[in-house]
Amino acid sequence: MKFSTTLLALTASIAAVMSADSSAAASGAASAASGAKSGATSAASGAKSGASSVASAAKSGVSSAASAAKSGASSATGGSSAAKSGSSSGAGFAPVAGAGSLAAIAGLLLL
């Protein structure tokens, strides 16, 4: 009977130790997996951030170039507009003078 009790206690102790070892191994594996996942997430985040920075810089460069080109085109258009305005006022002067002359002649006829 004493031998059975000792054997039962020894079996219970071995089971407890094995359970603790198994639990520690599972915990270690979970910790390692978590560390690997965290490292992978950090690497992916860093790569994404770097790609975003490069894309942002490229977009900014394209915007600046487009803005400069647009500004140049506006200046050219503005010059064209000034030339058009000058020619319009030059062309507009003759009809006004003609209308004034007609009004002067009509005024003289009324006298």
Curated annotation (Swiss-Prot):
Range of residues in the leader sequence: 1-19
| GO process annotations (BP) | cellular response to neutral pH; filamentous growth; filamentous growth of a population of unicellular organisms in response to neutral pH
Coiled-coil residue spans: none
The ranges of region (Disordered) come to 71-90
**Propiece residue ranges:** 82-111
Q: Where in the cell is it found?
A: Secreted, Cell wall; Membrane
**What does the record give as the function of this protein?**
Probable cell wall protein required for filamentation at low pH.
Task: Tell me what this protein is called.
Answer: Repressed By RIM101 protein 1
| Gene that this sequence comes from | RBR1
